[in-house]
């Protein structure tokens, strides 16, 4: 709906969202992705977020839902019943354990973005960085990184990892 110049409709498609951002109202969908429909938010977030960041009328949006939902069954030794996959749609699990979407969202919404998409043999140790903070200069931040080489499946020295 439209509330005092804010367009807040839930779950507009990607194309509809682009159209709404061209209207005079400020675009802030109160829910624009639902974890149930993409396995927990991470799958569709990048495209939506990049579109929203580029439109001056968009001021953000909300994801549904933070934590997996379910009923703790006393008749099943505390098993959390969410009727299959109907409540397992959160950014974190039912005990607030971090799930895959948590890390995706953390990376996509980080105010410091590493723009290098790949590191090749000519890599000189320098990264291109984008500052998405509104009021903070990156000279006040400290960055640590480590370059590692993971073994390839074809490496002769590859050994089994025992878990």
Which ranges hold each PLM region?
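Non-catalytic, glycine-rich low-complexity segments
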Residues: 86-124
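Generic recognition of flexible, low-complexity loop/linker segments
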Residues: 16-17, 48-50, 115-116, 131-134
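Beta-strand-rich binding/interaction modules
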Residues: 124-159
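Conserved small/polar residues in nucleotide/adenosyl-binding loops
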Residues: 161-163
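Substrate-binding/catalytic cleft of secreted carbohydrate-active enzymes
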Residues: 1-100
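Short, well-ordered loop/turn and helix-capping segments at boundaries between secondary-structure elements
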Residues: 35, 54, 111, 132-135
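Conserved, mostly hydrophobic/aromatic
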Residues: 61, 105, 129
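Generic beta-strand/beta-sheet core signal
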Residues: 30, 64, 117, 130-132, ...
């Amino acid at each position: 709906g439209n509330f005092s110049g804010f367009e807040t409709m839930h779950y507009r498609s990607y194309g509809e969202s682009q159209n709404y951002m061209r209207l005079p109202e400020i675009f802030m969908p109160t829910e624009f992705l639902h974890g149930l429909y993409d396995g927990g938010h991470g799958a569709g977030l990048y495209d939506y977020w990049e579109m929203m960041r580029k439109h001056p009328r968009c001021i953000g949006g909300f994801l549904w839902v933070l934590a997996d939902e379910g009923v703790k069954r006393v008749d099943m030794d505390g098993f959390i019943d969410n009727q299959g996959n109907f409540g397992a749609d959160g950014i974190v699990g039912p005990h607030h354990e971090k799930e895959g979407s948590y890390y995706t969202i953390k990376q996509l919404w980080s105010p410091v973005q590493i723009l290098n998409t790949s590191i090749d043999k000519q890599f000189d140790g320098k990264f291109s960085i984008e500052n998405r903070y509104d009021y903070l200069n990156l000279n006040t931040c400290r960055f640590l990184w480590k370059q590692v080489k993971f073994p390839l499946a074809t490496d002769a020295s590859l050994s089994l990892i025992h878990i």
